[in-house]
Amino acid sequence: MDRRESSVMKSPSLRLPAPAKLNLTLRITGRRPDGYHDLQTVFQFVDVCDWLEFRADASGEIRLQTSLAGVPAERNLIVRAARLLKEYAGVAAGADIVLEKNLPMGGGLGGGSSNAATTLVALNRLWDLGLDRQTLMNLGLRLGADVPIFVFGEGAWAEGVGERLQVLELPEPWYVIVVPPCHVSTAEIFNAPDLTRDNDPITIADFLAGSHQNHCLDAVVRRYPVVGEAMCVLGRYSRDVRLTGTGACVYSVHGSEEEAKAACDDLSRDWVAIVASGRNLSPLYEALNER
């Protein structure tokens, strides 16, 4: 029995979180010939998560159990991540994966990308591959522009398509996240003819001084007015209200858990609202006791 097969038998399972992220700013500074956009953004994790359970075996097959309907395995980022890692490393092992889905889809919280990143990190361990984090980030970029930040695992300033990352230590406030009753297509927003794509870049110092714009906001609200309505409602509870990614989720920033919970309790009569705590270290690596 080779080393990888032995490790699979000794450490057969892991249950790990796949956390949400918030974009604390999102600037579009250009469009590339390949159609991708040059961005500047700041990522921070929150303690609201999907959960995935992985059990390694020698079957060679990747099997996923999920309550999500209508997503073929070939398109599911969890399955694609597992198969990509398996092909890259040339391993014969397989895995059973169970997804407990808590994060909304199409919400700008990065749930699918986070699921893919947790899959890469978990199976790298269970299959005893020993790949470093940068290698996993490079693999993740082949799955989607947001996957690398979840593998990176620390709050960061990001440029390029979001893959050039610099650790950024930030306050860890409390947030109230509102989930409007709509699904925003990222591709639709980035292809919108009215999206401004040539905004001036800023510096980290500009962001820290209060430059928190999201350049997707106007295009999103024009197409999904309920997102603008959610922002107006949140504005009753905080002066700092923002859109994460291309939405649909919006969030407000609060100085204490008590303040955030009071706002959430009030909002929950009419909206789906979640209290979350900011995290500079991903809950994934907190669970693994890594930094």
UniProtKB/Swiss-Prot annotation:
EC number in record: 2.7.1.148
Reactions that this protein is recorded to catalyse: 4-CDP-2-C-methyl-D-erythritol + ATP = 4-CDP-2-C-methyl-D-erythritol 2-phosphate + ADP + H(+)
Pathway(s) it belongs to: Isoprenoid biosynthesis; isopentenyl diphosphate biosynthesis via DXP pathway; isopentenyl diphosphate from 1-deoxy-D-xylulose 5-phosphate: step 3/6
InterPro entries hit by this protein: GHMP_kinase_C_sf, GHMP_kinase_N_dom, IspE, Ribosomal_Su5_D2-typ_SF, Ribsml_uS5_D2-typ_fold_subgr
Active-site residues annotated for this sequence: 21, 146
The keyword Mitochondrion is assigned to this record: no
Gene3D superfamilies in UniProt: 3.30.230.10, GHMP kinase, C-terminal domain
GO biological-process terms attached to the record: isopentenyl diphosphate biosynthetic process, methylerythritol 4-phosphate pathway; terpenoid biosynthetic process
Keyword list, A-Z: ATP-binding, Isoprene biosynthesis, Kinase, Nucleotide-binding, Transferase
Signal peptide: none
Molecular-function GO term, any one: 4-(cytidine 5'-diphospho)-2-C-methyl-D-erythritol kinase activity
PANTHER family: 4-DIPHOSPHOCYTIDYL-2-C-METHYL-D-ERYTHRITOL KINASE, CHLOROPLASTIC
NCBIfam families referenced in this protein's UniProt entry, alphabetically: ispE (TIGR00154)
Family per record: Belongs to the GHMP kinase family. IspE subfamily.
Protein name, UniProt field: 4-diphosphocytidyl-2-C-methyl-D-erythritol kinase
UniProt source species: Methylococcus capsulatus (strain ATCC 33009 / NCIMB 11132 / Bath)
